[in-house]
From Swiss-Prot:
Organism: Tachypleus tridentatus
GO biological process, one term: hemolymph coagulation
Signal peptide: 1-19
An example molecular function term from Gene Ontology annotations: carbohydrate binding
Domain GH16: 27-257
UniProt function note: Component of the heterodimer clotting factor G which may play a role in defense mechanisms against fungi. Initiates a (1->3)-beta-glucan-sensing clotting pathway whereby the alpha subunit binds to glucans containing (1->3)-beta linkages, which are components of the fungal cell wall, and the beta subunit catalyzes the activation of proclotting enzyme.
GO CC terms in record: serine-type endopeptidase complex
Keywords, sorted A to Z: Glycoprotein, Glycosidase, Hemolymph clotting, Hydrolase, Lectin, Repeat, Signal
Residue positions of the active site: 137 (nucleophile), 142 (proton donor)
Post-translational modification: In presence of (1->3)-beta-glucan, proteolytically cleaved into a 55kDa and a 17kDa forms.
Name by which UniProt lists this protein: Clotting factor G alpha subunit
Glycosylated position list: 186
Length: 673
């Protein structure tokens, strides 16, 4: 039986006049801290950019968060560390757990003294791309200084003209004692509670006044800051050590509505691979704009090839591109065969909702709710750039898709957020997002970034946002003051000191937390940001080609005397230049799942005949064979050559050796024969 409550609604307030159903809360996630700190939490370390944007005084460390007696304890200390007077801790569920709508709560007891700033809050999942406050922020509770009879709930967002807007209200609550702080949130309204008693609400229905940010997924953050713009800079040193106790954090969703509980088995981020072509669903030109069409493309690992499947009701999903935040959309609400699939800001129409139907072997049909047709690759194309459209369901393989789970990690570092530097300068940038860029016009200059986390071992794509008036610049990337050199990259001419482009290379890093360094090998150039993205394992991304593994040539973990350059081959990215005899590349932990024959293909280009490569395992201890490289008519005219080799079952480091130069290589594919 549906229970209706009558109530009075103001834009901001507590009194209400509407009718709504009583939520039936179902627990979907929690951390009770009975078995330590869950792996769903990620620690943020350091002092952030400009003191986390607030000129805060503390340095965040992992060591300042521990479990004591079944409770998470964040301890702020008066201790000198890396140039800061205070340490504390900050945890978030970003990259691991995020939710859209529901009830989020924590049972907490917090300290109260001059200079403290305690927060339990949430931020939009897209914060790395749109920046604050456009990503939206809801503070379940924040408390500052010695006002121990008050806690505050706040909401921050960006208005349509880009201005920062916020509302807040205080609750008469003594935070030193344990209380349950909750927020209930749906597509229409956000409500704040202490111990089940509501004290604040804000209407967000229809994205009014720019509040559409609160209709996206969010992640949760816990932290205790010391000092800053809001609490001030007068800190009571006698109050340390100070402890913030969290008994639990819980997330509920409403089981009495159609969204989002139900069959949510596909909820999450995926690479989407076509069964017929074995290429991947991709947003054309990696666009963030409404109206950009979908296409198929070679695997890149980028976020424009990752899609969030969010269950709405009865096997109906909203499908959102991770990079742009836009939803898959049937062009102009079309119902006919041949209508293109594009991306568009989500509005909840049936042309933006899809049923997902399993056909076995890990493949699915994706069916627009408004037309009942299949999302397919047009004309049975196997070419990169093939169009994505809707068509009648004839069980065509071009309309079947493998959903390959993405567990990507991405971190954006503002170039000016270094903790140490030499011979660099800051200046205002005209790049998107504004702020500052770093001027690198002295050879030997460098910047160091503290406590950069690489959560798992493997390949990472490192992107740099750069500008230069002339060619010839070069940077190098290292870890821990140069003890581990990851690679070098040429900085091209972009046509001006404020004409920006993004360059990248792939590096191999063991899991761990490092100080990351950028060194100016050759000046002059500017840099605005660095982005680190975990590249998912290729072995999990080539399931559409049975017993096949594709290796991007630039994904080596070690090398000698080769260089990277932009490629004109299908799929873009980088190729490796092999123009020195004796040069080599090594690829880590390549699996040969059974003994026998394997076809090894190489995507190569050369201006002249006479090139030769050799293939070996484990630093040359097993030589598998050699292969001549023909003239292809140019260093960006690509062809595929191959040979058959015999390999015993096992996992090896695979090497490619330049017997005779010069040639380029884009990828290697290994297929069990």
């Amino acid at each position: 039986m549906l229970v209706l409550l009558c109530c009075v609604v103001l834009h901001v307030g507590v009194a209400r006049i509407c009718c709504s159903h009583e939520p039936k809360w179902q627990l979907v996630w929690s951390d009770e801290f009975t078995n330590g700190i869950s792996s769903d939490w990620e620690f943020e370390m350091g002092n952030g950019l400009n003191g986390w944007g607030n000129n805060e005084l503390q340095y965040y460390r992992r060591e300042n968060a521990q479990v004591e007696g079944g409770k998470l304890v964040i301890t702020a200390k008066r201790e000198d560390y890396d140039g800061f007077k205070y340490t504390s801790a900050r945890l978030k569920t970003q990259f691991d757990k995020s939710w859209k709508y529901g009830k989020i709560e924590a049972k907490m007891a917090i300290p109260s003294f001059r200079g403290v700033w305690v927060m339990f809050w949430m931020s939009g999942d897209n914060t790395n791309y749109v920046r604050w406050p456009s990503s939206g922020e809801i503070d379940f509770i924040e408390h500052r200084n010695t006002n121990n009879e008050k806690v505050r709930g706040t909401i921050h967002w960006s208005t349509p003209d880009g201005a920062h807007a916020h509302h807040n209200r205080e609750s008469n609550t003594n935070g030193i004692d344990y209380h349950i702080y909750s927020v209930e949130w749906n597509s229409s309204i956000v409500k704040w509670f202490v111990n089940g008693n509501q004290y604040f609400e804000v209407k967000i229905q229809g994205g009014v006044n720019g509040k559409s940010a609160f209709r996206n997924k969010v992640f949760v953050i816990l932290n205790m800051a010391i000092g800053g713009n809001w609490p001030g800079f007068d800190v009571a040193d006698e109050a340390f050590p100070a402890k913030m106790y969290i008994d639990y954090v819980r997330v509920y969703q409403d089981a009495s509505t159609s969204s989002p509980v139900g069959d949510t088995s596909l909820d999450g981020y995926y690479f989407v691979q076509n069964r017929h072509s074995e290429l991947y669903l991709d947003v054309t030109d990696a666009s963030n704009e409404d109206g950009a069409f979908l296409q198929q493309w070679s695997y890149s690992g980028n976020e424009n090839q990752q899609f969030d499947f969010e269950h709405l009701e009865n096997n109906v999903y909203k499908i959102t591109n991770k990079k742009s935040g836009k939803s898959l959309d049937v062009y102009n609400f079309g119902t006919e065969n041949g209508v293109r699939i594009q991306q568009w800001s989500y509005g909840g129409a049936r042309n933006q909702q899809f049923t997902v139907q399993s056909v076995g072997d890990g493949y699915y049909k994706i069916i627009p709710r408004g037309s009942g047709k299949l999302v397919e690759v047009a004309d049975f194309s196997k070419d990169a750039g093939g169009k994505i459209q809707q068509w009648s369901d004839n069980n065509q393989l071009s309309g079947q898709w493998k959903l390959i789970k993405s567990k990507s990690y991405s971190k954006l570092i503002q170039a000016e957020s270094y903790f140490d530097s030499s011979k660099v300068q800051l200046e205002d940038t005209s790049d998107v997002g504004g702020g500052k860029n770093v001027k690198c016009d002295n050879e030997g200059a460098w910047m160091a970034y503290k406590d950069i986390d690489f959560p798992s071992s493997g390949n990472y794509r490192i992107e740099y946002r750069v500008a230069s008036e002339r060619a010839g610049g070069k940077l190098s990337l290292d870890l821990n003051a140069g003890s581990i050199v990851l690679g070098m990259l040429d900085v091209p001419s972009t046509g001006g000191w404020q004409k920006w482009t993004t360059i990248s290379h792939t590096v191999n890093v063991d899991s761990g937390t490092y100080n990351l360094g950028i060194y100016v090998q050759r000046a002059s150039w500017n840099i605005n940001w660095i982005k680190i993205t975990k590249i998912p394992e290729q072995s999990n991304l080539n399931q559409g080609r049975r017993n096949s593994k594709l290796i991007q040539a630039e994904s080596y973990f070690s090398y000698s005397e080769v260089q990277l350059e932009d490629t004109l081959d299908v799929g873009g990215g980088k190729n490796v230049k092999c123009d020195k005899e004796g040069a080599w590349m090594a690829y880590k932990d390549i699996d040969f799942p059974s003994s026998g024959s394997y076809r090894v293909e190489y995507r190569v280009a050369s201006e002249r005949a006479g090139g030769k490569l050799s293939l070996d395992l484990n630093a040359g201890s097993i030589v598998l064979g050699m292969l001549d490289i023909p003239s292809t008519g140019g260093l960006q005219k690509w062809t595929t050559i191959s040979h058959i080799v015999n390999v015993d079952l096992g996992t090896y480091n695979l090497g490619i050796y330049v017997q005779k130069a010069s040639w380029n290589i884009n990828w290697i594919r290994i297929t069990k024969v």
